[in-house]
């Protein structure tokens, strides 16, 4: 029988009977199974974000270990993982319904060991060409793609009224990997903890040694552990199975492209600022030891993402998103007042404080826009199936599939911000010697998002 205990075991068995919208089923079985899958998914996604943003901590240190790359080249290394991550999120978003959440989570976590090991060896050899670092940075992008499949997978496990909180937790705590990496990397690069594997330090002017390989090697054992945990502890849902053909129609929805734009402004800002903040700070305030502070912004943004999902469940995603974009525009304007002019003036503490506010709102908006996506696409699909005379069971199944596909595809668009923001900073600095040009573009974009959110979802919320 489908209600046997076999599918419930934490052995990765396929669950054939899954009805999270049924209150009795949810209380008796569903909540326990969903929670277990969520809390294994979270550390897997957290580690993926650590790997995805590795170059945000490594690039700023490459000159210290003997590499002579230009500032624009270093910005490019921080930006490229977001390019491959964004492109790969599209196919990754379709993988869970094809292969199952357990199998795909284990596979996608395990393969991240490859760029981590390779980068550790590359940074120890100053003859390593720039092209090799480009390849490794693109491979780190596989980690960024994990977000699409992870969020799609978790969306299948939870009922509609709990999806905002669940997706907020998974995404928010997963996003925490950026700050965890930026906190841990500066600590471990000062320690000879992998000498047995060939890790060699480089003498610094202050007499200390920099073991840059540790910044990537430190994640390898944890990736191995949670690959095993995903394989044996998570479940595949038979009800989530769907071919790519069944998932593609969601791309025809106009709301998909509107929400992609809004998510680009929120999550794209979060991941873009995470990738480029350390390098930008180093160019504007060269005397500041920025890696001592860099982790604070992503940490606050990740916490805010969890809050954004839960807050949207209570107040409505549109309302939270609209207010959030207004705040992002205000903080972007304030940032101009904190920068030095011709190398003179400026206040790092004011710059840092405003950027923390931007990280906060980018994280909050990431959670609120994701909640909007879940609500919008579930309702659109259920209304369509009901209008066609379909059953409630079919409506719920197709709604879950469409929502997961939309979440994955929109997350791919959002990840592009991780490329554009650091690349925009690098290009603006190369052309004008200042990041102001890039910041003006961001400000205009946030104002446009205020107008779009109000025009499409604010005035016509009932529609």
Curated annotation (Swiss-Prot):
Changing residue 268 to A: Abolishes nitrate uptake activity. Nitrite binds at residues 89, 263. The keyword Transcription regulation does not apply. One of its GO terms (molecular function) is solute:inorganic anion antiporter activity. The record marks 305 as: Important for activity. It comes from the Bacteria. InterPro entries: MFS, MFS_trans_sf, NO3_transporter, NO3_transporter_NarK/NarU-like. Gene3D superfamilies: MFS general substrate transporter like domains. Induction: Highly expressed during anaerobic growth in the presence of nitrate. Keywords: Cell inner membrane, Cell membrane, Membrane, Nitrate assimilation, Transmembrane, Transmembrane helix, Transport. GO terms for biological process: nitrate assimilation; nitrate catabolic process; nitrate transmembrane transport; nitrite transport. It is found in: Cell inner membrane. Changing residue 89 to K: Decreases nitrate uptake activity. Changing residue 147 to A: Decreases nitrate uptake activity. Changing residue 367 to A: Abolishes nitrate uptake activity. Changing residue 305 to K: Abolishes nitrate uptake activity. The keyword Membrane applies. Nitrate binds at residues 89, 175, 263, 411. Belongs to the major facilitator superfamily. Nitrate/nitrite porter (TC 2.A.1.8) family. Catalyzes nitrate uptake, nitrite uptake and nitrite export across the cytoplasmic membrane. Functions as a nitrate/nitrite exchanger, and protons are unlikely to be co-transported. Each molecule contains 12 transmembrane helices, forming the N bundle (TM1-6) and the C bundle (TM7-12). These N and C bundles are connected with a linker loop between TM6 and TM7. The substrate-binding pocket is located at the interface between the N and C bundles. Substrate recognition is coupled to the transport cycle by the concomitant movement of the transmembrane helices and the key tyrosine and arginine residues in the substrate-binding site. This is Nitrate/nitrite antiporter NarK. It comes from Escherichia coli (strain K12). The gene is narK.
């Amino acid at each position: 029988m489908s209600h046997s205990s076999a599918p419930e075991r934490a052995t990765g068995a396929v669950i054939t009977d899954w009805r999270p919208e049924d209150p009795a089923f949810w209380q008796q079985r569903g909540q326990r199974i969903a929670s277990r899958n969520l809390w294994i998914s979270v550390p897997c996604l957290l580690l993926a974000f650590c790997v995805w943003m590795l170059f945000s901590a490594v690039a700023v240190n490459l000159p210290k270990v003997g590499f002579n790359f230009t500032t624009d080249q270093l910005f490019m290394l921080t930006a490229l993982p977001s390019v491959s991550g964004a492109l790969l999120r599209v196919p990754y978003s379709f993988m869970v319904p094809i292969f199952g959440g357990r199998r795909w989570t284990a596979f996608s976590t395990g393969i991240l060991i490859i760029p981590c090991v390779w980068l550790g060896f590359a940074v120890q050899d100053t003859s390593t060409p720039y092209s090799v670092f480009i390849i490794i940075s693109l491979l780190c992008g596989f980690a960024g793609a994990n977000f699409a499949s992870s969020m799609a997978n978790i969306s299948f496990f939870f009922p509609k009224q709990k999806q905002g909180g669940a997706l907020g937790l998974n995404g928010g705590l997963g996003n925490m990997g950026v700050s965890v990496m930026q906190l841990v990397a500066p600590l471990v690069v000062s320690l000879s903890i992998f000498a047995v594997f060939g890790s060699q330090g480089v003498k610094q002017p202050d007499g200390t040694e920099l073991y840059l390989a540790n910044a990537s090697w430190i994640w390898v054992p944890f990736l191995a552990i949670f690959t095993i945990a995903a394989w044996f502890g998570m479940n595949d849902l038979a009800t989530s199975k769907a071919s790519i053909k069944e998932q593609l129609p969601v791309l025809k929805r106009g709301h998909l492209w509107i929400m992609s734009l809004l998510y680009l402004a929120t999550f794209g800002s979060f991941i873009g600022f995470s990738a480029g903040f350390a390098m930008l700070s180093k160019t504007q305030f060269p005397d500041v030891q920025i890696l001592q502070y860099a982790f604070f912004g992503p940490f606050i943004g990740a916490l805010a993402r969890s809050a954004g999902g839960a807050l949207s469940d209570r107040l409505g995603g549109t309302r939270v998103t609209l207010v959030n974009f207004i705040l992002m525009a205000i903080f972007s304007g304030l940032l101009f007042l904190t920068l030095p002019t011709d190398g003179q003036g400026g206040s790092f503490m004011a710059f840092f404080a405003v950027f923390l506010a931007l990280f906060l709102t980018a994280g909050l908006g990431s959670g609120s826009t994701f909640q909007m996506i879940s609500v919008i696409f579930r309702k659109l699909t259920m209304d369509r199936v009901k209008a066609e005379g379909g059953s409630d069971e079919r409506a719920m199944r197709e709604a879950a599939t469409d929502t997961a596909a939309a979440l994955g595809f929109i997350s791919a668009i959002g990840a592009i911000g991780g490329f554009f923001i650091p690349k925009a900073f690098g290009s603006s600095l190369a052309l004008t010697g200042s990041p102001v040009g890039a910041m003006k573009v961001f400000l205009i974009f946030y104002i446009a998002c205020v107008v779009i959110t109000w025009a499409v979802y604010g005035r016509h919320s009932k529609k």
